[in-house]
């Protein structure tokens, strides 16, 4: 409500349910402190930034002590810095209040930073669900369809394997060197990236393995319980026809 102050905006749900002025004042001031807007109590929405407006909306949603806080594309219109600050706030609220937070988003960085569990919806139905770590490690088809396959120039010979594993210390980063040493085989790394998941990091790499060593490599990965999948090579002509 553009004409009302931040205080009045947050107080509205409690006013509708006929809470006393004392109860409203106590609750609103507690929430203003929680979302970091105590100094904006008397400001009007037109004088707030996008991130501050989201903080007001979060505070207002918490006035009635809900069991679940639904955030529907809460960061979609915000810049990366503000997005991070809002996610930090939501994580802080989750820890302090113990409230369940459901985040609806198309931004995968939001899922990786703030969520413990995730489900992927396709045509109104749950296609896959699980912990965020498991979903991004296993890379189910629903996730790949959502993200769009990253184009990598893949060799047409041998086997192109995408490998995903957690990289939280120097030992984890030695996977490929140790695998090459253990198997006596040097393989090219075609692509690689590190993604952050709250306080953890996951590496996603693509390697090329010849036919002779394919079985040994995959057995090695399975024994180490490292997730892998073989990438399909699609000719550019076939892509154009599709």
Please name every model-derived segment:
Residues 80-82:
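Helix N-cap at the start of a conserved alpha-helix in ABC-type nucleotide-binding domains
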Residues 69-72:
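Catalytic Walker B motif of ABC-type/P-loop ATPase nucleotide-binding domains
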Residues 58:
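Hydrophobic anchor residue at the start of the ABC signature
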């Amino acid at each position: 409500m553009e004409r009302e102050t931040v205080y009045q905006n947050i107080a509205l749900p409690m006013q509708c349910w006929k809470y006393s002025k004392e109860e409203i004042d106590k609750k609103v001031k507690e929430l203003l402190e929680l979302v970091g807007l105590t100094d904006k109590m008397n400001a009007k929405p037109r004088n707030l930034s996008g991130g501050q407006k989201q903080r007001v909306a979060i505070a207002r949603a918490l006035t009635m002590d809900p069991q679940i806080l639904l955030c529907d594309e809460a960061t979609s219109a915000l810049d990366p810095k503000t997005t991070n600050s809002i996610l930090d706030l939501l994580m802080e609220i989750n820890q302090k209040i113990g409230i369940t937070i459901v985040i609806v988003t198309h931004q995968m960085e939001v899922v990786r930073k703030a969520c413990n569990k995730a489900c992927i919806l396709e045509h109104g139905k749950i296609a896959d669900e699980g912990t965020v770590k498991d979903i991004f490690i296993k890379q189910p088809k629903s996730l790949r369809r959502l993200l769009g396959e990253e184009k990598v120039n893949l060799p047409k010979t041998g086997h192109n394997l995408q490998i995903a594993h957690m990289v939280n210390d120097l030992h984890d980063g030695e996977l490929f060197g140790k695998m090459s040493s253990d198997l006596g085989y040097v393989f090219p790394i075609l692509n690689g990236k590190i993604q952050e998941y709250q306080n953890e990091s996951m590496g996603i790499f693509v390697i090329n393995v010849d036919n002779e060593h394919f079985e040994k490599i995959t057995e090695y990965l399975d024994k180490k319980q490292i997730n892998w999948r073989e990438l399909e090579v699609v000719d550019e002509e076939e892509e154009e026809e599709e």
